C-alpha cells in the first residue's frame, strides 16, 4: 500500500507505516510502500 511519505531508503518507512496502522514498508519510487496487517 503506497502512502504519501517520501523516502530515500526503506529504513525511513518503518515508522510511517506503523503510524498508518500497517506492518513494515520499503521505499519504492521515492515513496513508502507499506504491507497491510
From Swiss-Prot:
Presence of the UniProt keyword Disulfide bond in the record: yes
Tissue note: Expressed by the venom gland.
UniProt-annotated stretches for the region Interaction with Ca(2+)-activated K(+) channels: 25-32
Record's keyword terms, sorted: Disulfide bond, Ion channel impairing toxin, Neurotoxin, Potassium channel impairing toxin, Secreted, Toxin
Matching InterPro entries: Scorpion_toxin-like_sf, Scorpion_toxinS_K_inh
Gene3D superfamilies assigned to the protein according to its UniProt record, in alphabetical order: Knottin, scorpion toxin-like (3.30.30.10)
Gene Ontology cellular-component annotations: extracellular region
Pfam families the UniProt entry points to: Toxin_2
Gene Ontology molecular function: ion channel inhibitor activity; potassium channel regulator activity; toxin activity
Disulfide-bond pairs as recorded: 7-27, 13-32, 17-34
The keyword Transcription appears for this protein: no
Compartments in which it is found: Secreted
SUPFAM superfamilies the record matches: Scorpion toxin-like
Domain comment quoted from the record: Has the structural arrangement of an alpha-helix connected to antiparallel beta-sheets by disulfide bonds (CS-alpha/beta).
UniProt function note: Binds and inhibits potassium channels. Intracerebroventricular injection into mice induces paralyzing symptoms followed by death. Its binding affinity to rat brain synaptosomes is 5-fold lower than this of KTX 1.
Assigned protein family: Belongs to the short scorpion toxin superfamily. Potassium channel inhibitor family. Alpha-KTx 03 subfamily.
Protein name: Potassium channel toxin alpha-KTx 3.9
Organism: Buthus occitanus tunetanus
Gene name of this polypeptide: KTX3
Amino acid at each position: 500500500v503506497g502512502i504519501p511519505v517520501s523516502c530515500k531508503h526503506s529504513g525511513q518507512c518503518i515508522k510511517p507505516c506503523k503510524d498508518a496502522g500497517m506492518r513494515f514498508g520499503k521505499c519504492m519510487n521515492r515513496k513508502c510502500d507499506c504491507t497491510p496487517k
